[in-house]
Amino acid sequence: MRRDTFLKSLAALAATGGLPLSALAATNLKMMIPANPGGGWDTTGRALGKALLDGKLADTVTFENKGGAAGALGLAQFVAGSKGDGNAIMVMGAVMLGGLITGKPPVSLSSATPLARLTSEYNVFVLPANSPFKTMKDVIEQFKKDPGSVKWGGGSRGSTEHIAAAMIARQVGVDATKINYVAFRGGGEATAAILGGNVTIGGGGYSEMAEYIAAGKMKALAVTSGARLKGISVPTLKEQGIDVEIGNWRGVF
């Protein structure tokens, strides 16, 4: 979902009382964003904060970023520091679920209360602008030849782009344990690594990459949707003979 569309949608929901957060009737909200600045959770959290202010559901919203371990570090801090605090909320999503399953931290989502699912989107795989590769086929050929030579960059281990890379490996006959996956603490760090050419191929939410794709700073190879996304001329993995489809979602606890 485009960021401007998301903001308008949240503002409309807030104005009509359509967000479950209206039940809090808080004047000063504290929002935990369990990722470093610049990524999808950060964008979602700050857009939500703006919508709550615009909808007069909060007088102030303060944000705290705590990245790492697919959101588990932020979750642990949120649970420990905000127990029983009705004015504390946290952004989360599918990435956190994957991280909790793979990382097995001592904290779980059972310690928090789900409020709303806010957004859904598909991922895109991209190349740095200076990459010697041109297509997904080029990347896959090198990946099959020498899996370790292809650095896949994205969010924390267990993120949807990490899972998608493993699914791609399985589809093309590569042992998923041989994937050279470089995990970052948030989408902002992953984006910087892609722009800097520090990874071979990067993945993340399309909304996070859109401006760089449009500016020619990244080359979009494939989206992880079942069919092409409306208004976006990027082929799906399925179109390119790789039967992989996986989406991402974000919500608030």
Please tell me what each predicted stretch does.
Residues Q77-A88, L100-E189, L237, I242, ...:
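Hinge/capping helix and adjacent helix->loop/strand transition within the periplasmic-binding protein
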Residues T5-L24:
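N-terminal export signals
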Residues A94-M96, S120, N130, S207, ...:
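Solvent-exposed coil/turn segments that connect beta secondary-structure elements
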